[in-house]
Amino acid sequence: MPKGTGKVIAQNKKAFHDYFIEETYEVGLVLQGTEIKSIRAGRVNLKDAFARIHNGEVWVHNMHINTYEQGNRFNHDPLRTRKLLLHKKEIDKLAGYAKETGYALVPVRIYLKNGFAKMALGLAKGKKQYDKRHDLKEKEAKREIARVFRDRQKM
C-alpha cells in the first residue's frame, strides 16, 4: 500500500490465492452516502469482485456493500457497479494489459485514507492449479517450522 494509508476495511484473500498480483494501483471510489457509511462499518465483501474498462472508465462489478442499517428508502443496491477514479494514463496502461490474455483487474483491499474510501486495484495474472498447490505446500511448511520453534521455546 502507498504511504499514509489508514485503516484497512476489507481484503480480498481469494485474489492472492487465485492470481499473481503484479502491480497495485490506489484508486478512488464513486459512492453514495449510505455506501460510505456501510464501508466505515466494515460491511463490504470483495470475494467475487472484478473490474472492467468500458468507454475509457474503470468499473468494479460484484463488490457487495451491505445496505446501511439506519438507512431508509434511500438505501443503495448492494451489488451495483461502481465507478473507479484513476488518471487517464493509468487507465490506458491498464487497458493495454487487460487486453492481453491471462490478465485481470482485481480489487485487493479497501481502506480509509484521510476520510476517503480508497481501493487497491491489482493487475493480476491467473494462477494454474499446480501453482496454487505449490503455494499451499509452502504455507504449510512455514506453519510447521513455526510450530516446531514455538514448541522448542516452551521447553
Swiss-Prot record:
CDD domains per the UniProt record, alphabetical: SmpB
The entry's keywords: Cytoplasm, RNA-binding
Keyword tRNA-binding among record annotations: no
Gene Ontology biological process terms from the UniProt entry: trans-translation
Key word RNA-binding present: yes
GO cellular component: cytosol
Gene Ontology MF, one: RNA binding
Location within or outside the cell: Cytoplasm
HAMAP family in UniProt: SmpB
Function per UniProt: Required for rescue of stalled ribosomes mediated by trans-translation. Binds to transfer-messenger RNA (tmRNA), required for stable association of tmRNA with ribosomes. tmRNA and SmpB together mimic tRNA shape, replacing the anticodon stem-loop with SmpB. tmRNA is encoded by the ssrA gene; the 2 termini fold to resemble tRNA(Ala) and it encodes a 'tag peptide', a short internal open reading frame. During trans-translation Ala-aminoacylated tmRNA acts like a tRNA, entering the A-site of stalled ribosomes, displacing the stalled mRNA.
Family per record: Belongs to the SmpB family.
Protein name (database record): SsrA-binding protein
Biological source species: Bacillus mycoides (strain KBAB4)
Lineage, broadest ranks: Bacteria, Bacillati, Bacillota, Bacilli, Bacillales
